[in-house]
A protein has these predicted regions:
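Conserved N-terminal subdomain of the carbohydrate kinase-like
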Residues: 10-94
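Structural motif
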Residues: 94-95, 140
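Short, well-ordered alpha-helical microsegments
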Residues: 27, 104-108, 127-131
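Conserved phosphate/ATP/ADP-binding segment of small-molecule kinases
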Residues: 113-118, 122-182
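Catalytic beta/alpha-barrel core
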Residues: 97-102, 121-122
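Short, small-residue-enriched loops and turns at beta-alpha junctions
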Residues: 73-77, 104, 125-128, 150
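Histidine-anchored nucleotide/phosphate-binding helix
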Residues: 2-10
């Protein structure tokens, strides 16, 4: 989520990020970077003693992931109650971007109560299944090939297979039109 928020800021968009941060050097870095690019963290929370979510990606010579290590435990603090307390703010957004590092119950609660359009990033094949019950509540989805295969049930071996996978995703109730699958 932070990478998407960061890049939207760089594109000149007004962005607020609702998240949780730990009490560590990574959180300080996130706050400093957010200030530098104009990313609003007003509706975020600091978890006493918490470790800010981290993700390390190691690419091979071909650019594909060879290894990834993460610590996302802090996102368990983004509960339905955490979201409920911020829902008025969230519902006034032009677009809500969420991802599957959130607990499944929180993702489902958000999708049931959010009146703003929602774009979801599956983030990984391990976490993508959390989106299956809420696909019909989403406005847009940002899967990679493997995540699209998992959520659509369609094997994508060539570029010609992608439209069939997109159709299957739209049949799940994904809102809007063909442009919803980005």
């Amino acid at each position: 989520g932070r990478n998407i928020a960061h890049n939207l800021c760089l594109l000149g968009e007004e962005v607020s990020m609702v998240t949780v941060l730990g009490q560590d050097s990574f959180a300080q870095s996130v706050r400093e970077n957010a200030t530098a690019i104009g990313l609003d963290l007003t509706h975020s929370a600091v978890i006493p003693g918490g470790r800010t979510g981290t993700y390390l990606f190691i690419a091979g010579p071909d650019g594909d992931m060879e290894l990834a290590v993460n610590d996302m435990d802090i996102y368990e603090h983004i509960t339905p109650e955490f979201l409920r307390q911020r829902m008025d703010f969230i519902n006034h957004a032009d677009l809500v971007v969420t991802e599957t590092n959130l607990p499944a119950a929180s993702l489902q609660w958000l999708c049931q109560h959010c009146t703003a359009p929602i774009l979801a990033d599956p983030v990984s094949t391990i976490k993508a299944p959390k989106l299956a019950p809420v696909l019909g509540k989403l406005t847009a989805l940002k899967p990679n090939r493997m995540e699209a295969e998992l959520l659509s049930g369609v094997k994508i071996e060539t570029a010609a297979d992608a439209p069939h996978a997109a159709e299957k995703l739209l049949e799940t109730g994904l809102q809007q039109d063909r442009k919803s699958v980005v």
